[in-house]
């Protein structure tokens, strides 16, 4: 719920305790309660929509909020921030030169998504991932979509994340993407849109679970007894899903979570998920391949591994096949994978499906593979490999968000209105030299 007119490139939870007073036109305690005089400024409000009254699903939450003063909200918010720091709930921003480890932002006013809205979002994400899986099965198989001109062949076969090693290699249940991070934003008009897909090694779910736990501890009187769908069983659900892709004949599979190690930006999440699933957290040096089978080194000897939930990018996964200088992967892992002796989630080669240029074709792929209309729309996207897309981007670069197509996690993104003239000039030079490597999108004015 934001009243600011500042444009944003991606949704960010409000920093704990910041700007609480500025959200409201009147001091707490005056007639009408805490939200008296609140002005949405023409933006969709997650609590009140475009009206000055609580949305049906938020009536009870707003009533409870009226029982808090600004001072009490700030006090609890600050306490929550300290607890996040104590628990180590942080993430790393490598491009931030001043502060590498950052605390997870915590908003004292929770976003409420009514059940009927959530069901539509859920259906839209399922539809999207189904199309992406069909697309991956196709491009690593008969390549019908390329032959039918649904998507340019050079965009796929020339993609840095296309893995020829996956050609004609079957995967369990035809599923390449088992865990997908779909970035969804709601604009000032109240409409949800997909900003991008993350189908390689997406992270962030641990922060959702921890945020919920902290909200329940910091504001028990705010959320107690509200009909909220649980998120604490995510680890159990993930372990069950991973068990289903174990090699044939394995009834009680050994699952491990493969991490690059403590210096990875999402290492907190790796620890969290391994603990929640009840599986070993391993690094490449903890695994070995013998006779095309994967084993884990233990004090009792070698133990067979059947499913690897990997949080390691393709390039570093197996030095025999990908980067030979990788010290993070497992030599011979792809041999075991090809033989069907171990399952990987997500599968190798999924990066081509979440490429930001391919993103622009996802609605078309949904229609092609599923014969359905997209449930959730894309954000307007300009493909710089196309002359009109390049011209549009160069002419308006200072007002657009420019993204490298093959990166993930926000790396290399240039937010036109927020960078210096020097940084914008450097980005323009890179774009002009290699337009096929970029797409652009408008700044999204968020709810």
Q: Model-flagged regions — what are they?
A:
Residues 1-447:
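Preference for protein termini
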């Amino acid at each position: 719920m934001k009243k600011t007119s500042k444009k944003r490139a991606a949704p960010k939870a409000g920093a704990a305790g910041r700007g609480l007073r500025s959200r409201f036109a009147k001091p707490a305690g005056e007639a009408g309660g805490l939200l008296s005089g609140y002005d949405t400024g023409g933006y969709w409000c997650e609590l009140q929509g475009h009206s000055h009254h609580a949305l049906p699903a938020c009536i009870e939450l707003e009533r409870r909020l009226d029982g808090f003063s600004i001072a009490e909200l700030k006090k609890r918010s600050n306490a929550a921030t300290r607890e996040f720091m104590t628990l180590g709930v942080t993430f790393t921003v490598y491009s931030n030169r001043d502060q590498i480890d950052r605390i997870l932002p915590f908003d004292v006013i929770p976003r409420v998504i009514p059940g009927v809205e959530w069901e539509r979002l859920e259906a839209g994400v399922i539809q999207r991932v189904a199309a992406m899986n069909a697309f991956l099965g196709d491009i690593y198989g008969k390549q019908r979509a390329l032959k039918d001109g649904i998507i340019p062949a050079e965009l796929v076969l020339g993609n840095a994340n296309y893995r020829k090693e996956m050609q004609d290699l079957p995967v369990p249940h035809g599923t390449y993407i088992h865990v997908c991070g779909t970035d969804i934003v709601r604009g000032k008009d109240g409409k949800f849109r997909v900003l991008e897909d993350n189908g390689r090694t997406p992270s962030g779910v641990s922060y959702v679970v921890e945020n919920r736990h902290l909200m329940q501890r910091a504001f028990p009187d705010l959320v107690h007894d509200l009909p909220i769908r649980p998120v604490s069983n995510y680890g159990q659900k993930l372990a069950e899903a991973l068990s289903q892709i174990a090699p044939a004949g394995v009834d009680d599979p050994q699952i491990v979570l493969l991490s690059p190690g403590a210096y990875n930006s999402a290492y907190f999440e790796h620890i969290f998920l391994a603990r929640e699933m009840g599986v070993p957290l391993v690094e490449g040096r903890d695994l070995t391949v013998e006779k095309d089978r994967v084993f884990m080194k233990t004090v009792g000897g070698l133990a067979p591994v059947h499913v690897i939930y990997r949080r390691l990018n393709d390039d570093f996964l197996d030095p025999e096949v990908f980067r030979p200088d990788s010290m993070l992967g497992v030599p011979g892992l792809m041999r075991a994978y090809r033989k069907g002796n171990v399952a990987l989630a997500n599968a190798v080669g999924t990066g081509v499906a979440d490429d930001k240029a391919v993103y622009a074709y996802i609605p078309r792929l949904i229609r092609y593979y599923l014969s359905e209309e997209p449930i959730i729309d894309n954000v307007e996207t300009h493909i710089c490999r196309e002359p009109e897309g390049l011209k549009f981007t160069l002419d308006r670069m200072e007002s657009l968000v420019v993204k490298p197509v093959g990166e993930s996690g926000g790396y290399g993104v240039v937010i036109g209105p927020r960078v210096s003239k020097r940084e914008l000039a450097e980005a323009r030079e890179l774009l002009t030299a290699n337009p096929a490597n970029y797409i652009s999108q408008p700044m999204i004015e968020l709810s």
